[in-house]
Amino acid sequence: MIHCGICGKAKTADVQFICCHCINGSPAVLLRDKMNLLILRQEVEQLKTAVEDQLETGFAGEGQLGRQLQKLDIYNEKRRLIKLRQRLQLARNKVQLKRNKYNELLQIMSTNGYLEESTSATDSIDLEEQAAEESASLDTLSHILARNQKQLFAELCRWFRIRKSDEDDVFSYTIWGLPMVNLKNGSELDPSIMVSSMRYLQQYLQLAFRIWLFKAICDKPIENDRNIIENFTQLIYDTLDILRARKLVSKSVSIRDILIRYDLDGMIYHLSQNKYLSSLDDASNSYPPTMQNIKQLVMSMIPSI
């Protein structure tokens, strides 16, 4: 019989046998290991909770993981939109070819009286049917493209968390939890916060241009607060550009009036909500929304610069 190495004398020196009583109750054997195990389990639970929180925050779009995943979604959706746009263009080309052929046949039939009326009528009906089918296909693709663009743009606005703040009278709107810069009170912000807010606005506008298949004139990144006038000018110009393309402002909009009424942050918010911005018109086009004119307005509306 083998004796316990703790409560009895082991017959074999190099074989350590421990009985059930000592395993369950001897502090000299397992108390320390049990304590280490409990501590390890507690640490594992804490790490598990931390990992779950990080994943939940990340997939919600508030962390680095969420931002990368959303960038990937936007990239994939952009590829789909480009392919859809190519299909749309091909359909348009087909419709145009059918129309050209139809017009050519009409011209031939009008100049050559020897063509039989029955044959001419049949060809005309066939061409009209083909043109109608191609036109219906073109309309379907246009609707699909528009629907996908609207859905993707809505996701973009939710991603950047563009909100209207009723608690702050100075900065009425926020982006990614930061105050959205404006001409009227932008100088009151800390320089680092101002630059971060401008960067978020620039990223938002760049992605919006890509979704709506427009091309921005300038992609120069905002790096610091030294070129604050140029930064404001570029952001306002891009915002006006996409607002006009989306028909959310009048084509002959007065840039002075719209900046006084809405400022940059209000224009961005209305864009995110797809709301029309009412303003006075510059019917004579005496002050067109060029970079130079916008820059002069920016300088006049920020006296501290």
UniProtKB/Swiss-Prot annotation:
Similarity-based family: Belongs to the ATG14 family.
InterPro entries: Autophagy-related_protein_14, UV_resistance/autophagy_Atg14
Disruption phenotype: Still forms preautophagosomal structures (PAS) in proximity to the vacuolar membrane.
Further remark: Kluyveromyces marxianus proteins are shorter in length and have a more ordered secondary structure than their S.cerevisiae counterparts, which might contribute to the superior thermotolerance and solubility. K.marxianus could be therefore useful as a new model organism for further elucidation of the molecular details of autophagy.
Annotated protein name in UniProt: Autophagy-related protein 14
Function summary: Required for cytoplasm to vacuole transport (Cvt) and autophagy as a part of the autophagy-specific VPS34 PI3-kinase complex I. This complex is essential to recruit the ATG8-phosphatidylinositol conjugate and the ATG12-ATG5 conjugate to the pre-autophagosomal structure. ATG14 mediates the specific binding of the VPS34 PI3-kinase complex I to the preautophagosomal structure (PAS).
Membrane topology: Peripheral membrane protein
Main location: membrane
Organism the protein comes from: Kluyveromyces marxianus (strain DMKU3-1042 / BCC 29191 / NBRC 104275) (Yeast)
Subcellular location field: Preautophagosomal structure membrane; Vacuole membrane
Assembly description: Component of the autophagy-specific VPS34 PI3-kinase complex I.
A Pfam family reported for this protein in Swiss-Prot or TrEMBL: ATG14
Gene (UniProt): ATG14
Entry note about domains: Coiled-Coils at the N-terminal half are essential for autophagy.
Domain of life: Eukaryota
Any single GO BP term: protein transport
GO CC annotation: phagophore assembly site membrane; protein-containing complex; vacuolar membrane
Coiled coil: 34-147
Keywords tagged on the record: Autophagy, Coiled coil, Membrane, Protein transport, Transport, Vacuole
